[in-house]
Amino acid sequence: GLTRFQVTIGEVDYFRGLCEEAGLDENTEKELRSCISGKNFFAAQELLEQKQIPEPYHSILLKLADMFENIESLEDAKSLVKNERSLQAIARLEKLRKRLEQYGVAEYITFDLGMLSKYQYYTGVVFKAYTYGIGDAVVKGGRYDNLLRKFGKDTAAIGFVIVIDDLLEALSRQKVVI
């Protein structure tokens, strides 16, 4: 199997709570999500300036790209907000990190609070898995509690997709025989 991989975990509620705290309307949040998820920080900066988002929120929202990889960044992220939604998101990630350490897999995990999906139905944790030999994620997924309500079932859910073609290509490049 694969031995060289990395799973990146984000938390949509951190971003949503921060947007609420900053007073962003729904359309601005949607546009900003698109900019940040596409790593288009020039567009994000332009949008925040255009909408006259005040400090410290202007800087904090742009800083999402830097809140990546280590637990110190989670501590930094916690210190930047006052709202309960964002603080709870960080608490969930810290709890998850501790559990992953207990299982001995923390070395394969990074955190990225700037990892936002263009799909607005995600409500909490989002994740992507990468491996050597492929430039894009081979696994993508997250939590989407409200999506099933649209189909008549009000329940929490989490799901993911495995990009089989990319995974098989990675296995081939890594000379993993299956």
Give residue ranges: language-model regions.
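Short acidic alpha-helix initiation/capping motifs at coil-to-helix transition points
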Residues: 8-10, 36-40, 88-89
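Short, conserved phosphate-binding/catalytic loop or strand-edge motifs used
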Residues: 9-17
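Short low-complexity, flexible loop/linker segments enriched in glycine and/or proline
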Residues: 20-23, 125
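Acidic, His- and aromatic-enriched active-site or binding-groove loops in soluble protein domains
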Residues: 23-46, 53, 105, 131
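Amphipathic alpha-helical segments within well-ordered protein domains
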Residues: 16-19, 33, 45, 78
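Positively charged, Gly/Ser-enriched RNA/tRNA-binding surfaces
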Residues: 1-2, 47-178
